[in-house]
């Protein structure tokens, strides 16, 4: 069975870590720390010069993880991400060129949206799993609640502004598949090589989300 974006988000739930890798020598240890905390899906953003090299190294050394490329803002980046071994692609917005490049690459694609018009555009391109970006706390929670009526069957991954304090408020929404988060692997802990703390942050997020599944 071919991998779909819906399958990626289901596996990522509750949190898809959004990684900014500045030092490629730390990439594998970072991925291992997150995996030790129960994380099995990672998004490596293409915001740094060695991001694709880091992604390729993770794919080679950590085959149990599902690893995608994020912050794709140019059409050519989709094929570059695929060549590096990315298993899915994420962008902060959605354009005709990006949608066409995603289709050509064959990668499962999570386009970013913020408004009803952008959701409709993504739907025209056939995408039903969408990234809500930027997600800014209470305002985005209200927006997602309002989206539930007209956009039946659409699943969102809110990203940007999600924290442990509002994580459950997002995950309780029936149209939220998972959330994207940078707080699990903050740059200061990565630079400090504080792998145990990163593992703990990942485990705490999973435990917090697990409370939703507990009987009342």
Where are these regions (language model features)?
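Conserved N-terminal beta1-alpha1 strand-loop-helix module at the mouth
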Residues: 1-87, 104, 153, 164, ...
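Glycine-rich beta-to-alpha transition loops that act as phosphate-gripper elements at the mouths
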Residues: 20-24, 69-75, 91-95, 111-116, ...
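Distinct, well-ordered alpha-helical segments
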Residues: 27, 55-59, 123, 144, ...
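Catalytic cores of alpha/beta
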Residues: 30, 74-84, 117-125, 162-178
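Short hydrophobic/aromatic-enriched beta-strand-loop microsegments
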Residues: 65-69, 87-93, 108-113, 128-134, ...
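Hydrophobic, well-structured mid-protein blocks that either form specific transmembrane helices
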Residues: 78, 82-122
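Glycine-rich phosphate-binding active-site loops on the catalytic face of alpha/beta enzymes
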Residues: 88, 92-98, 131-141, 175-197
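Anionic-ligand binding region
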Residues: 116-130, 140-150
């Amino acid at each position: 069975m071919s991998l779909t974006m819906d399958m990626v988000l289901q596996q990522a739930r509750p949190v898809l870590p959004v990684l900014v890798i500045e030092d490629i020598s730390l990439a594998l240890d970072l991925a291992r720390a997150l995996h030790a905390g129960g994380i099995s899906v990672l998004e490596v953003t293409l915001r740094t010069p060695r991001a694709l090299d880091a992604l390729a190294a993770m794919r080679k050394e950590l085959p149990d993880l599902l690893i995608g490329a994020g912050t794709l803002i140019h059409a050519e980046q989709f094929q570059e991400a695929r060549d590096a071994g990315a298993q899915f692609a994420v962008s902060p917005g959605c354009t005709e060129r990006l949608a066409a490049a995603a289709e050509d690459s064959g990668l499962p694609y999570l386009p970013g949206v913020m408004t009803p018009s952008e959701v409709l555009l993504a739907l025209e391109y056939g995408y039903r799993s969408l990234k809500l970006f930027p997600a800014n706390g209470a305002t985005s929670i209200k927006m997602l609640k309002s989206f539930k009526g007209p956009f039946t069957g659409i699943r969102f991954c809110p990203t940007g502004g999600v924290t442990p304090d509002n994580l459950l408020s997002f995950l309780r929404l029936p149209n939220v598949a998972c959330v994207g988060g940078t707080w699990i692997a903050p740059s200061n802990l990565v630079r400090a090589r504080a792998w145990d703390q990163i593992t703990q942050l990942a485990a705490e997020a999973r435990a917090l989300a697990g409370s939703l599944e507990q009987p009342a």
